[in-house]
UniProtKB/Swiss-Prot annotation:
Keywords: Ribonucleoprotein, Ribosomal protein, RNA-binding, rRNA-binding. It comes from the Bacteria. Residues 39-107 form the KH type-2 domain. This is Small ribosomal subunit protein uS3. The gene is rpsC. One of its GO terms (biological process) is translation.
Amino acid sequence: MGQKVNPIGLRLGINRTADSRWYADSADFGRLLHEDISIRKAIREKLKQAGISKIIIERPHKKCLITIHTARPGLVIGKKGGDIEVLRKELAKMTSDEVRVNLVEIRKPEIDATLIADDIARQLERRASFRRAMKRSIQSAMRLGAEGVKVVVSGRLGGAEIARTEKYAEGSVPLHTLRADIDYGTAEATTTYGIIGVKVWVYKGEILEHDPMAQDKRLETSGQSRARANTNQRGPASGAQAAGA
């Protein structure tokens, strides 16, 4: 079972928590869910070069707190904070709540599954060898502390007439072990031959305590620090309840 399902979804409530952290009644749930989808899509399209890993959305009373995990916070903030203020105003048009934007800097993008997948996809779009791209990314992740990495690419690889799937892995990736800290990311490479899908699994060790926020705490203590980028007055975020949308 662990080989088939999304490893993040499988571990929700054990050592992971959802990226949408709010509660809503049935009358508002659909609207808020579509707002979340639109916000994430807009951020990823506008900040393609910023190395966006994940976007966390919390909704305390009448507020929308957006936390962007990025490898290049300076690119998001812009000169004197101008770019992030423009982004905040654009996002505010998508929701009726007050929008605040925070940034978290990713100190080691080489072991972030989403960023690895994006990097491989960009290399494939530049006609790089898929084997070389996979091997280089895996070796870089292993060198910087990952205990295991698996990469799968699927499509018309190298312009072949028949689509196929290729896999490459190093180290251990125990997908059945629920206490394992496994990061998972996907990306698509748009080539002249069609779309090539990229999937990446990164194993970073075990989380022994039963705590849905364990991975977030571990990221903060292992080198990922919060970058200041609150574009409005600072307000308490403790009203957000952890829940999955």
